Design a protein with these regions (language model features):
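Short acidic/glycine-rich loops and adjacent helix/strand connectors
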Residues: 1-185
């Protein structure tokens, strides 16, 4: 980046700490519990912070779990979503479209534990197809880019994935919400 953007000084910033600071400084909170998670940065995927004075944001926990990749990975297999030429391009658009499809679907309680397990297994660009194959065997869903899921099945997949995402998120967040019940999130 130094060759592309000339400057006198460069400051390296931690990705999630920057998210945490941005969130905090847009409020008037003196203390806060802050959760920053996304597809990753130079300081992890899912970080939980505590600040008690607006000047010091303390890292409480760093989970090595990317919830973004498994969430968006279903986009290739849903016919309501335009298939992108490569998953890394879909990474930028699939999640929002899947969120929209959730409203049409119903959570399939039989599928739910398998979807939660899919999230916990840390799928990434190298192993997600293997993990989707396991999910297929467990749920009966077929993940085939040449025969994409349609209608209620696709919508139920979206809703079930959303519920699994939220449940796994809460597994990580709840201990801190319990420990700091009077500190705003």
């Amino acid at each position: 980046h130094e060759k592309l953007i000339p400057a006198k000084n460069y400051h390296n910033s931690l990705h999630h700490l920057s998210h945490a600071a941005c969130a905090l400084y847009q409020t008037d909170y003196q203390e806060a519990l802050i959760i920053s998670f996304d597809g990753g940065g130079n300081d992890g995927f899912f970080n939980i912070y505590l600040t008690k004075d607006r000047d010091n944001i303390q890292l409480l926990e760093k989970y090595n779990l990317d919830l973004g990749f498994p969430y968006m990975s279903f986009g290739d297999y849903l016919s309501d979503i335009r298939k992108e030429p490569a998953l890394n391009i879909g990474n930028l658009v699939y999640s929002g479209k899947i969120m929209g499809l959730c409203s049409y679907g119903n959570v399939n309680k039989k599928w739910l534990p398998y979807f939660e397990n899919y999230y916990r297994r840390k799928p990434d660009g190298l192993n997600y197809k293997e993990y989707l194959n396991d999910l297929s065997n467990e749920t009966g869903l077929i993940f085939d880019i040449n025969n994409r899921l349609t209608g209620q099945t696709a919508w139920d997949l979206s809703a079930t994935s959303q519920e699994a995402f939220e449940n796994v998120f809460m597994e990580m967040a709840q201990p801190f919400l319990d420990k700091y019940p009077n500190i705003p999130l």
